[in-house]
């Protein structure tokens, strides 16, 4: 019989870094062209007017303007960016 206890190492202690996904700019907020609006996996939010979609599904603004979250159909959401004049007419 052995006189020493076998000491094993724990198999825990690993975790992946968070990906910092989510909405970065909110409804009514002013953004500059190229600003990241939403970081996502898949298309939870669709690109709307003046919004582009990157290779990793990130949504970004194509123009300087104001962010507007809208419904697209029954169960999809879209993010658009409007100029100040457009935003005032859409908001009312």
Swiss-Prot record:
Residues 1-21 are annotated as: Disordered. Keywords: Ribonucleoprotein, Ribosomal protein. Gene3D superfamilies: 2.40.50.100. SUPFAM superfamilies: Ribosomal L27 protein-like. Pfam families: Ribosomal_L27. Residues 12-21 have a biased composition (Basic and acidic residues). PROSITE patterns: RIBOSOMAL_L27 (PS00831). GO terms for molecular function: structural constituent of ribosome. GO terms for cellular component: cytosolic large ribosomal subunit. Coiled coil: none annotated. Belongs to the bacterial ribosomal protein bL27 family. HAMAP family: Ribosomal_bL27. This is Large ribosomal subunit protein bL27. It comes from Halothermothrix orenii (strain H 168 / OCM 544 / DSM 9562).
């Amino acid at each position: 019989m052995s006189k020493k206890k076998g000491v094993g190492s724990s198999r825990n202690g690993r975790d992946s870094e968070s990906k910092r996904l989510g909405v970065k700019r909110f409804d009514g907020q002013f953004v500059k062209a190229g600003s990241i609006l939403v970081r996502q996996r898949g298309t939870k939010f669709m690109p709307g007017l003046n919004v582009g979609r990157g290779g990793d599904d990130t949504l970004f603004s194509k123009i300087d303007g104001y962010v507007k979250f809208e419904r697209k159909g029954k169960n999809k959401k879209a993010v658009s960016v409007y100029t100040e004049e457009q935003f005032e007419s859409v908001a009312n």
